[in-house]
Regions:
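Active-site loop/oxyanion-hole signature of alpha/beta-hydrolase fold enzymes
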Residues: 50-90, 94, 258
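Conserved HGGG/HGGXW glycine-rich cap/lid loop of the alpha/beta-hydrolase fold
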Residues: 7-62, 85
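Conserved serine/cysteine hydrolase catalytic core
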Residues: 178-231, 240
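Short beta-to-alpha linker loops that shape the active-site pocket of alpha/beta-hydrolase fold enzymes
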Residues: 53-57, 119, 244
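The conserved beta1-alpha1 loop
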Residues: 24-28, 92, 214
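Catalytic histidine-centered segment of alpha/beta-hydrolase-like enzymes
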Residues: 241-257
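Conserved hydrolase catalytic core segment
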Residues: 86-126
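Helix-rich cap/lid subdomain of alpha/beta-hydrolase
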Residues: 122-174, 190
Length: 265
């Protein structure tokens, strides 16, 4: 584990292994570098693998209550400074939104981009369909639960939305409690993604190829975001991981890793 200084202040924790062209992995909004543990073990030799890890204890980039994707992109810039060259950036879920933002605002920092079901909710604001209604409903019910102090119910619905009914209840109790403690510390971060400056116009400005990965069992939200990406990116590659839902770095790591390696420039 290494701590790196982040431009503008603070630090970011990374886990790294190997040598060669740098490949940087960004985790989901409720996860950590552990989401990439199996991918690291399966990745062929010849790359410098770097996973950005989560903040703990309520800390995080930027100012609490006023965080933006720029703060999370700052973590990527810290890694680029650390490795001394442009990186292949792979972002999952929240990390995918950060990767898209970085590609639009700092293309010189990147050698390539891959996004795995990025939660770029701002792309759905102009879409008149069930996907935006679904994610707004999930957000609003989550906030109602949290205001009432019902964190279990808030994340039971959230986790089940992305993993299937009954998923959260099947977690071991100790894992659930540790997860909820961590999420209480992180707080309400919905607006970071809903208000992100990721639009059809910013996507069209991205000149580099972007590898868009989705699961065959993607939610209506992730499928709609993927459609917006493929419609607006100038140079998009598209892969579908058969049988996978949103949490494919954990559930379908082998096929996902093969897909990512195969499309890496």
């Amino acid at each position: 584990m290494v701590l790196l200084p982040v431009p503008g202040g603070g630090t970011v924790k990374i886990i790294e292994r190997g040598a060669g062209p740098p490949v940087v992995f960004l985790h989901s909004g409720v996860g950590s570098a552990g989401e990439w543990r199996e991918a690291f073990s399966l990745w062929p030799e010849g790359h410098h693998l770097v996973a950005v890890d989560a903040y703990r204890g309520g800390t995080g980039p930027g100012v609490p209550g006023h965080r933006t994707l720029d703060d999370y992109a700052g973590q990527v810039h810290a890694v680029v400074e650390h490795v001394g060259r442009p990186v292949h950036l792979i972002g999952f879920s929240w990390g995918g939104a950060t990767a898209l933002h970085t590609a639009a605002t700092a293309p010189a920092a990147l050698a390539s981009v891959a996004v795995i079901e990025p939660e770029a909710y701002s792309l759905l604001k102009g879409e008149d369909g069930p996907a935006f209604a679904a994610i707004c409903g999930l957000r609003d019910r989550w906030r109602e639960y949290v205001r009432a102090g019902h964190w279990y119910e808030a994340f039971e619905e959230f986790v089940d939305f992305y993993n299937g009914p009954g998923s959260f209840a099947r977690w071991p109790a100790a894992r659930r409690e540790a997860f909820l403690d961590d999420q209480r510390a992180r707080g309400d971060l919905w607006d970071v993604l809903f208000d992100a400056p990721i639009t059809a116009g910013t996507l069209a400005s991205v000149a580099m190829p972007v590898h868009v990965v989705e699961g065959a069992a993607a939610t209506v939200v992730d499928r709609a975001i993927g459609e917006v990406l493929l419609r607006n990116l100038r140079c998009a590659e598209h892969s579908v991981v058969e049988g996978a839902g949103h949490m494919m770095p954990l559930t379908h790591a082998a096929e996902l890793t093969r897909t990512l390696v195969r499309h890496l420039p």
